[in-house]
Amino acid sequence: MANIKLKNYQSYAKINLFLHILNKRDDGYHNLQTWFTFLDLKDHISFRFNNSNKIEITSNIQIASKEDNLIYKAVKEFQEAYNIESIGVDIDIIKNIPMGAGLGGGSSNAATTLIALRDYYLPELSNEQMIPLATKLGADVPIFVYGRSAWAEGIGDVLYSKDFEQQYVVLVKPNIHISTKEFFESENLVKTKNMLPRDLSFDTSVMHNDFENVFFAKYPEFKSQLDEIDQDFRMTGTGSCFYLLSKDLNKLQQLARKVDKSLDKWVVKTLNYAY
């Protein structure tokens, strides 16, 4: 066990460059294909290990109760999976990644927690060895444990390293949301029938987000807002964040100034590693 009692980590956001829903599995999950890359938008998490045998979580925002908190669940799953007799840790998180945005904030925090616990208790474990445990916490948690841009299949847990050429990103987030359950039950969801080859370059003509039609069918006025700025916005995950990619930072900064003041916005850049 390491002697360092306090460790600080950065917990990064992700976007889905595309998201194709293929079919429903016997376990209730859906097989998918997606390409993940990261953003330099991040939360900051500190872990102070102690002998209290208590897990305390604080934040700069209101957070879920322990039973509903992915960070807490990550600690308990790690403790059970690796037979750690007792864990005492004070966890403080400074949230910058918006919640309910499709940016993976909660999943990223859970993955960062697994990595911090690994570093302290079992430093011999590799990130890849923790992916089955990460999958138990949610379909987006494995990519953050994996820690680099990747093509994903299965439920998001079968990962193949695949870099994405760095670009700038403008993110736009409306104060609206659709539940995952509603997405899958919508008559507007058209699933992708054919799998794409993993060596495919980024191609917006064949890569899309199957959930976009559902979102725009429910909120057509938001689509109109986006189209007035630029018609190439794409949704990440199940939203509600939309993003626009460009190698031209000045262009994106100018477009960001056109975004309605009622919408949250960020200008960031993509990253191939979440370290």
Curated annotation (Swiss-Prot):
Q: Does the keyword Disulfide bond apply?
A: no
Per UniProt, the enzyme's principal EC class comes to transferase
The pathway entry for this protein reads as: Isoprenoid biosynthesis; isopentenyl diphosphate biosynthesis via DXP pathway; isopentenyl diphosphate from 1-deoxy-D-xylulose 5-phosphate: step 3/6
Any keyword Kinase?
Answer: yes
What function is annotated for this protein? Answer: Catalyzes the phosphorylation of the position 2 hydroxy group of 4-diphosphocytidyl-2C-methyl-D-erythritol.
Task: Quote the protein name from its UniProt record.
Answer: 4-diphosphocytidyl-2-C-methyl-D-erythritol kinase
In the record, biological process GO terms are: isopentenyl diphosphate biosynthetic process, methylerythritol 4-phosphate pathway; terpenoid biosynthetic process
Q: Native species of this protein?
A: Francisella philomiragia subsp. philomiragia (strain ATCC 25017 / CCUG 19701 / FSC 153 / O#319-036)
Q: Which family does it belong to?
A: Belongs to the GHMP kinase family. IspE subfamily.
Q: Which GO terms describe its molecular function?
A: 4-(cytidine 5'-diphospho)-2-C-methyl-D-erythritol kinase activity; ATP binding
Q: Which InterPro entries match?
A: GHMP_kinase_C_dom, GHMP_kinase_C_sf, GHMP_kinase_N_dom, IspE, Ribosomal_Su5_D2-typ_SF, Ribsml_uS5_D2-typ_fold_subgr
